């Protein structure tokens, strides 16, 4: 991973903080520490454009945006995992990870455990691949918006009933 990637990733952290209803000075301080550590303020970092910011602009609806945010948060959690033994930046990463945890998962430790469990699943393991394929039908069914489909059918039935009674 290049320093450009690191810089753009931390730029997203700053952007997320500005979009929040509150921002704490320690959060900015920790990002500054990470920027210094990764030398993320050099002129070559923006080369190639933003890492996440342009993608976030394309996702407007809140429910859709949650999908892309989950992928971005997953990236950061993996990123922090790589450097977990680095004492120079450990505190900074912990502060930022905790803030992401509060904002994205509403402080639910159960959700955090599930989220971390998912991002740690290795996709190159044959047994994991077999389990994933075995569960695919149920996962696909869970992804389909059943409640909206029922509401739509009810609305169509009511609308057809109104037209028939005229």
Swiss-Prot record:
Tissue-specificity statement: Released primarily from activated T lymphocytes.
Main location: secreted
GO molecular function terms noted in the UniProt entry: cytokine activity; type II interferon receptor binding
Keyword set, alphabetical order: Antiviral defense, Cytokine, Glycoprotein, Growth regulation, Pyrrolidone carboxylic acid, Secreted, Signal
Positions bearing carbohydrate: 39, 106
Signal peptide boundaries: 1-23
GO cellular component: extracellular space
A Pfam family matched in the record: IFN-gamma
InterPro entries linked to this entry: 4_helix_cytokine-like_core, Interferon_gamma
Pyrrolidone carboxylic acid, modified sites: 24
Subcellular location: Secreted
Gene Ontology BP annotations: adaptive immune response; astrocyte activation; cell surface receptor signaling pathway via STAT; defense response to virus; extrinsic apoptotic signaling pathway; Fc-gamma receptor signaling pathway involved in phagocytosis; humoral immune response; macrophage activation involved in immune response
Function in brief: Type II interferon produced by immune cells such as T-cells and NK cells that plays crucial roles in antimicrobial, antiviral, and antitumor responses by activating effector immune cells and enhancing antigen presentation. Primarily signals through the JAK-STAT pathway after interaction with its receptor IFNGR1 to affect gene regulation. Upon IFNG binding, IFNGR1 intracellular domain opens out to allow association of downstream signaling components JAK2, JAK1 and STAT1, leading to STAT1 activation, nuclear translocation and transcription of IFNG-regulated genes.
Family: Belongs to the type II (or gamma) interferon family.
PANTHER family the UniProt entry points to: INTERFERON GAMMA (PTHR11419:SF0)
Quaternary structure annotation from Swiss-Prot or TrEMBL: Homodimer. Interacts with IFNGR1 (via extracellular domain); this interaction promotes IFNGR1 dimerization.
The protein's name in its UniProt record: Interferon gamma
Biological source species: Sus scrofa
Gene for this chain: IFNG
